[in-house]
């Protein structure tokens, strides 16, 4: 990844230890917060897939809105987990990682854990949600940098395939996610890929619905969810 350089992801109690990765010239930093740091509830169950992941899928949360302080971003992660576990009946928060407006990386399900964020891709991808509504506004630079650094680190540690394909959520289901402005941004990133309808089909995954608060006043293009929410 160009211009990232030395990526230093400070590990705070995370079992998948993040270390220094020599990726070129220049220095970028990001901090990873563990599940215990943001007060995550225990998952109902954890299912792993064999890495490295061939896909990275970018999301926006839409709701909750962008957070700029770490306490607010921690609450946003808890709110998303509550919605996914308690309302949808899923095993855990749907995403692999969250990115806050504070520039922090928040551990969701983590690497090599089957997610609940993208149909057909849950068992072969890293799902990264940038907290906020990015339909018309671009996320702050620190959020974009954190996402890039996380991807670069995942490649360096072998969690993400070096030839990974970068996708926006809208490419794998009928949704505005990750928002038009953010989608335009990631379209310029290395590894962004245009896909066809037959890629990534898996019989082990099921359609999922992104985190949208039930009282959101300006809904995204709606998803057609199954009668019973999948527990993934």
UniProtKB/Swiss-Prot annotation:
Residues 213-232 are annotated as: Disordered. Its cofactor is Zn(2+). GO terms for cellular component: extracellular region. Gene3D superfamilies: Peptidoglycan recognition protein-like. Disulfide bonds join 67-73. It catalyses: Hydrolyzes the link between N-acetylmuramoyl residues and L-amino acid residues in certain cell-wall glycopeptides. GO terms for molecular function: N-acetylmuramoyl-L-alanine amidase activity; peptidoglycan binding; zinc ion binding. Zn(2+) binds at residues 59, 169, 177. Binds 1 zinc ion per subunit. Changing residue 175 to K: Loss of function. Residues 53-179 form the N-acetylmuramoyl-L-alanine amidase domain. Residues 1-15 form the signal peptide. Induction: Strongly up-regulated by PGN from B.subtilis. Regulated by the imd/Relish pathway. One of its GO terms (biological process) is peptidoglycan catabolic process. CDD domains: PGRP (cd06583). The record marks 95 as: Essential for zinc hydrate coordination. Glycans are attached at residue 196. The keyword Iron-sulfur does not apply. It holds the Pfam family Amidase_2. Its EC number is 3.5.1.28. Belongs to the N-acetylmuramoyl-L-alanine amidase 2 family. N-acetylmuramyl-L-alanine amidase involved in innate immunity by degrading bacterial peptidoglycans (PGN). Probably plays a scavenger role by digesting biologically active PGN into biologically inactive fragments. Has no direct bacteriolytic activity. Monomer. This is Peptidoglycan-recognition protein LB. It comes from Drosophila melanogaster.
């Amino acid at each position: 990844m160009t211009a990232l350089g030395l990526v230093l992801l400070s590990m705070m109690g995370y079992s998948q230890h993040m270390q220094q990765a020599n990726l070129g010239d220049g220095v970028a930093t990001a901090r990873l917060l563990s599940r215990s740091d943001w007060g995550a509830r225990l998952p109902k169950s954890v299912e792993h897939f064999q890495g490295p992941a061939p896909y990275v899928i970018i999301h926006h949360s839409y709701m909750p809105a962008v957070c700029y302080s770490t306490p607010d971003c921690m609450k946003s992660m808890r709110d998303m987990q509550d919605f996914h576990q308690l309302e949808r009946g899923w095993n855990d928060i749907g995403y692999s990682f969250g990115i806050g407006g504070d520039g922090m990386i928040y551990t969701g399900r983590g690497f090599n854990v089957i997610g609940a964020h993208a149909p057909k891709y849950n068992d072969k991808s890293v799902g990264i949600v940038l907290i906020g509504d990015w339909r018309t506004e671009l996320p702050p630079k620190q959020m974009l940098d954190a996402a890039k650094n996380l991807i670069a680190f995942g490649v360096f540690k072998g969690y993400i395939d070096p030839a990974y394909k970068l996708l926006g959520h809208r490419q794998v289901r009928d949704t505005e996610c990750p928002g038009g402005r953010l989608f335009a941004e990631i379209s310029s990133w290395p590894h962004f890929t245009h896909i066809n309808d037959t890629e990534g089909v898996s019989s082990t995954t099921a359609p999922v619905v992104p985190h949208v608060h039930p009282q959101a006043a300006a809904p995204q293009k709606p998803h057609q969810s199954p009668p019973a929410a999948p527990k993934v």
